[in-house]
Amino acid sequence: MTRIEMAKKGIITEEVRQVAQEEGVFPEELSQNIAEGRVVITRNILRNIKPLGIGKGLRTKINANIGTSRDKTDIQEELEKLDIAVKYGADAVMDLSTGGPLTEMRRAILKHSSVSIGTVPIYEVAVRAIEKYGNIVKMTVDDIFNVIEEHAKDGVDFVTVHCGVTKKIVEMLKSGDRVLPIVSRGGSILADWICYHDKENPLYEYFDRLLELAKKYDLTLSLGDGLRPGCLADATDRYQLIELITIGKLKDIAISEGVQCIIEGPGHLPLNHVETNIKLQKSICKEAPFYVLGPLVTDCAMGYDHIAAAIGGALAGMYGADFLCYVTPSEHIRLPDKEDVKEGVIASRIAAHAADIAKGYAKAWQRDNKMAEARRNFDWQSQISLSFDPDKVHSMRSERPPLEDEKVCSMCGEFCAIKISRRAVE
């Protein structure tokens, strides 16, 4: 039985109890949310890692993307990025590799990782199609499902599948009323195939086959937003919403068949669209876990897109998004390096933490209360350990320490407001 099937029968597993204890929720409530598709636990039955709960009533989680490209295929560097992502707090990591030995890359990441791993199998299908047939559009239906099963057999915990990029939507896109028709790599690959063959998206047409495969491994399906807006001008348009409605229906089918689902979301959104988008998804998809890329709240933050994404992510999380995909400073520019990964993870963690505070998540509040107490007591060791980047904080304080009183910092010195006010009122 899958997790959903066990939860529907009222069976509370040790895995559920473990997640419930970590999150500070009742196992019975968590199990009910799993049964009804409001929470997922992403762990392939073939992997022995700490289970990751994502969804209603749980801490906001973050994902970091790594992986090779055709321009850079250094597996060791990607493993180092994985270590950095986990060190700074990524709850999950996705391998988005498109260059080099993809199977070797994926298996190395799975072997090396202590956290949930996700992939986008259509990337590998496309790479193999070019190698085998000389063209992406020559890939077959069996090619697609065979690669998905390979990923599942290797132990991948969740996969992005762009089931909502239907033939109807692709035909609608030809009207030309979008600035950026498709910015999803997987979505564009499937749209290209649909147009060439004049056939329906195999992931939509044969969704039952996908569910059968997912059940074998208790593989979580991340229903990808192939029509997500790639710029503010396209935000919350008809293509995005039609796809959301489509994957919402597919999600209901999946839950009824015992398969866990996450819903992926935008993308590029102006701040005043964020609340509406979260509420629409939660309504249409019946509170299924929502996984957002950012969202980026401006198109013009190149080099600083991690900041734009953190602003959007904090707001999205506050309104109910459950899973934030990080964005790095190199977004829209190049393949991220190790420093980009670190900066992206930290920015996303801050956003998720800020959202959890707004949601009233007890452990988030406890951390901030401890920081406030440490500042009151000039407890620098605690302040450093409670920060999101202790190494950086320690280094900054060491580089420019106070000249006289070690309690204060070199910004205010003897004019420290906390020191003066405590002297005055205590």
From Swiss-Prot:
Entry superkingdom: Bacteria
Residues annotated as binding [4Fe-4S] cluster: C409, C412, C416
Coiled coil: none
GO cellular component term, pick one: cytosol
Broad enzyme group: lyase
Binding locations of substrate: N65, M94, Y123, H162, S184, R185, G186, D225, G226, L227, R228, E264, Y291
Binding site for Zn(2+): H268, H332
InterPro entries cross-referenced by the UniProt entry: ThiC (IPR037509), ThiC/Bza_core_dom (IPR038521), ThiC/BzaA/B (IPR002817)
Recorded catalytic activity of this chain's protein: 5-amino-1-(5-phospho-beta-D-ribosyl)imidazole + S-adenosyl-L-methionine = 4-amino-2-methyl-5-(phosphooxymethyl)pyrimidine + CO + 5'-deoxyadenosine + formate + L-methionine + 3 H(+)
Binding note for cofactor: Binds 1 [4Fe-4S] cluster per subunit. The cluster is coordinated with 3 cysteines and an exchangeable S-adenosyl-L-methionine.
Listed cofactors: [4Fe-4S] cluster
An individual GO BP term: thiamine diphosphate biosynthetic process
Keyword Lipid biosynthesis in annotation: no
UniProt keyword Magnesium present: no
Pfam families cross-referenced by the UniProt entry: ThiC_Rad_SAM
EC number(s) from the headed UniProt entry: 4.1.99.17
Family, per entry: Belongs to the ThiC family.
PANTHER family documented for this protein: PHOSPHOMETHYLPYRIMIDINE SYNTHASE, CHLOROPLASTIC, THIAMINE BIOSYNTHESIS PROTEIN THIC
Name of the protein described by the UniProt record: Phosphomethylpyrimidine synthase
